[in-house]
Amino acid sequence: MDLGLNTDAVCTVMQSDGTVLARKFIDFPGEKDRLKHVLGRISRSQREHGPSRYRRQWAYAVHLNEELAKMTARAIVDFAEGQGADVIVFEHLEMKGRIRGSRKQKLHMWRKDDIQNRSEHLAHRKGMRISRICPWNTSSLAYDGSGKVKRDPDNHSLCTFANGKRYNCDLSASYNIGARYYIREILKPLPATARSLLEAEVPAVKRRTSCVHADLVQLAKALGRIAA
């Protein structure tokens, strides 16, 4: 599950061998446009009248942000339930301390945190678990193992892989998030000897902050060879 900059959420249903069963892009453009217009009015009001005049507008922006989080969380959990998912995997968000950045950036971070919390409550009611993985490089590394991605300057939802492949940035990140969860769950319960054997077969899984979907596929194949 990737809570991206371009789309409210990108969901991928994945098996432990890396097989992708379903995908879904969750987006509410109308609500985001409304929020964008409110933030624009706040900026103009602050320039013309100072900070004291935009408090009511800011409260309205926060309310719109919360409503967007509710809608997104509900859509995520409904999709997961419909696909028979057992676990919903998010990136771990570091929310300690003061969040810096523009109003838009602050609202985006608050919304991501709110979506995760609301999704967790909804998922538990439906018998699903929530898990979180390290977010480092999930978006910057291509899911196919080709290396760093280059964002499209004109369309930030798209990127180009090092091998020339064009792909959706948030979808690639969603694959990597699911893969890191399975890599951790596969390796963690194994005895040290078995884990070392698999890590020798697929060295990339030793460093979790750079693991991608392609590494899970290779790990699943190595596990099958060893089991055979």
Residue ranges: model-predicted function:
Residues M1-A228:
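Positively charged, helix-rich recognition surfaces that bind polyanionic ligands
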